[in-house]
Structures are given as structure tokens and as C-alpha cells.
Amino acid sequence: MAGEEALFELESADHSAGFEALPGMALEDLMAPDWADALSGVEDELRSALAFVAAEATGGTHVLPAASNILRAFRQPLADVKVLILGQDPYPTPGHAVGLSFAVSGQTRPIPRSLSNIYREMESDLGLPPRVHGDLSAWTGQGVLLLNRVLSVAAGAAGSHRGKGWEAITTAAVTAVAGRRNTAGQQSPLVAILWGKDAEAVQPLLGGAPVVVSAHPSPLSASRGFFGSRPFSRANALLRMQGADPVIWELPPLP
């Protein structure tokens, strides 16, 4: 695929050159074809956001995640999405952000505490053993879209890229996920797992799709409604009600 080849070239380039190339790339080289079509209406906003991160990176700011992973969530075909898990912005710790909400590289140790809490709740909910790694890509292969509301961050500065244009792109993305219809005109199967107030704020964009809402898994809030919320079994029950296959949430022992 041309897009995969183009993104591979970004991975091979030096840090700033990778970011510098992003604003001029065709949408089809940055994401799956159906995402390119769905986000064409916010292409100008997307290129503006990419130009912002390119300027930051070439100006010496350590931007996370890597250029090749900024739009990683959109490499997964839109047509395959059946669960949306919405995060806030990427982890600001260098080496953590990989372009998928809540996930880290399979080699990252220790894993972030929010992800540890997600594993703890998964064990309580489904009886699945926690993993020592934070690679969640096995979920994306089953139609779980791990999308952050904001797609970049400056290292060490959580929330630093809020209000820089990403929100328009992710608003369009959530709207596109919720707006899919089958041949009978019915909404395609979808469950949104919304952790925390920021995620919950997108609920009006979901077109009535079922949601699982709770506190955020952050150590600051997990004990105030995340633990015991059983998001994984509830999401699977809602998928079955829509005639969709449940997600196999168990992750490989090693990535």
C-alpha cells in the first residue's frame, strides 16, 4: 500500500524531517482510504494541525508521538470500527506515546499507571490476567478504535497541544464513526467507552450509539467510579445486542 510505504519512509527519516513531511502528504498516504474520505471535509484543519507540529518539531520541541505515529489510529479502516475508546492526549513521557490512546510500546517498562488500572479492572471484570506490557494493538485488529481527542503533545507538558486544531479532526472522526449506516439504513454496530469528563463530552456526537461511561482510569480518579464499572463485559453485551461479535479483550502475554 502506498500509504504504508510513505509512513515507513517517515520512520526512516530523522526526527524533524519526519514531521516536516507530514503537511504535504496526500491523505491516502497518511491513513486508510475510507478515513481519508471521511476526513476530507476537515482536510484544511488537519493540514494546519500537522503544520503546527512540524513547526514545533523543527523548532526544537520534542513532539510526541513520533511523526510516523501521529495519525496511527486512522490506519485502521473506518469500516472495521465497532468500539471507540476515547483518550485525552498522548502520554507526555518520551518513549510512551505510540499514537493509540492508553497504549504504549510493548517494550515500555513500567507501564503507565492509568493502563495498570485498566488491566486491574479487566481482571476484575473478565478474570483476565494483567500484562506487563502495554501493547494494545491486538484490540485494534478486532475493531477497537483507540483515539485520543488531541493527537500530539510536547514532551513533559501534558495538554500542551490542546486548542491547536486537533479537536476539529477528532470531532469529525467521532462523527464519522457514529454516522456509518448499513444497507438497510441502520447505524452500524458501535459502542463508545467514555472514561472521564473530556471523553463524556463527545456523547452528543454519537448519534444515540450505546455508551459505557465512567470515571477516568487515572490514579487521581480511578477509585471514584472507574473500578467496578465493568466496561469490557458491558461493551460486549451491547455489541451482541446489535448483532456484532464481542471483542476478545485478552492480550497476548508478550507483544
What is each PLM-predicted segment?
Residues M1-A13:
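A charge-rich, low-complexity, intrinsically flexible signal that marks solvent-exposed coils, linkers
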Residues D14, G18-F19:
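N-terminal low-complexity, Pro/Thr/Ser-rich intrinsically disordered segments
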Residues A21-L22, Q88:
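Short, charged low-complexity linear motifs
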Residues G24-E28:
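Intrinsic low-complexity, intrinsically disordered segments
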Residues D29, P33-L194, D198-L206, P210-V213, ...:
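A polyanion-binding, active-site-adjacent surface
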